[in-house]
Amino acid sequence: MKWVKRIALGLAIAFLVSTVVNASWLAAPPKGYPRLLAHRGMMQQFSRAGLSDDTCAAARIEVPVHDYLENTLPGLQRADGLGAAMIEVDIAATADGQIALFHDRTLDCRTNGTGEVSKATMAQLKALDAGYGYTADGGKSFPFRGKAVGYIPTLEAALNAVPTVPLLYNLKGKTPDETPRLITALKAAGRDVVKVGDGFSAPDSELAAIRAAFPGVWAYSEDSIKACTKAYLTSGWLTMTPEACRNGTIAVPLNYQWAFAGWPNRLIARMEAVGGHVIVTGPYRAGSAMGLDLPEQIGEVPSTFNGVVWVDDIWTIGPALHPATNHRNAREEAETAAALEVRRKARE
C-alpha cells in the first residue's frame, strides 16, 4: 500500500527535521553552572509511598545519618556549607503577626504541640520541641526528641543566618494574610529579594501581589509550572515557546529529558528569551522524591545546564557536585552509604 509508505516516509522526514531544528548544539552553551536548590535546607529523608497532604512525614523517616532538621537555622547553614546555591523554606504566619519557618499546617506531627501553627504566637512556637515527632521505627524510638527545643525560627533569624543565600519562599495559603505578612516582613528586614535572587512558590491567587511588591522577582505556582511544562512538550518541537512559559518556569524531570525539544542548550535559550526559568527535578514516578536524592543522579544533569536543580538530599548531592564540601567522618560515610543502598533497593 503506497499511501501507507508515503505517510510513514513523511512522518519520518518530519521527525528528522524536527530533531535537527531543535538540536541543542544550535544554541551557544549557556553561561553559568547548575545551582543546587536545597529543599527545606537540610532535612531528614522519608518514604513518599502513599504520601498525602494528611500524612505525617516525620513518622516515616529513614534511619538518620545526620542530626539536622528541616526549616531550622542549623539546617539552613549546613545546606549552605554543602554547596546549596538556593534554599527552599516554608512560610507560616503566627498568631502575633510574625513569620515563622514551618512546613505543616498543624503542630501535631513534628512537635510536642497541638493545633494550627497560625493559632500559636512566636513565643509559643519557640517553646516547642521541633524534633519531638520524628521516628524511623514506627514510634519505638524518637532520635531527635529533646534535642530541638526552640528550633522553630523566625523569618528574620533565617535571613540573618544565611544572609547572602537566595531563598525560595514556599507559601501554601495556610492563612489569608500569609502573603501580605511575608511581603511586609521582607521589606521591614530590608531584604532586596530581586538583587539577592530570592524566589516565591505560591498559589496562583497570590502571584500578582508578590510581583507587584517585588517587580522582576521569580515567582511561580504549581499550576503555572504544569501549564508551561505541558505546553512546551508539544509546541517546543515546533520551535515555539508557548505563552504559558513567558516569565514562567518549566520543570524537566531527570527521566524525561529526552521529551523536551532542544534540551538542554536550545531550551534554556528559549526560556531565557521570554524571561523564564528552568528547574531540573528528580525522576517523575510514583513514590519518588521531587528532588534529587541519590548522588549518582547529579551525573544525569547536563554539564551545560545553568538553572536550578531541585535537591531533596543535599547531604549527599552537595558533595557529589562539590567534593570539597564533604567533611563526613568515617562513621558518617559508612552510615550514609548504607542508607543510600536501602533507598536504592526500595525503588527496584
Range-by-range predicted roles:
Residues 2-348:
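Phosphate-group recognition and catalysis centered on beta-loop-alpha active-site segments
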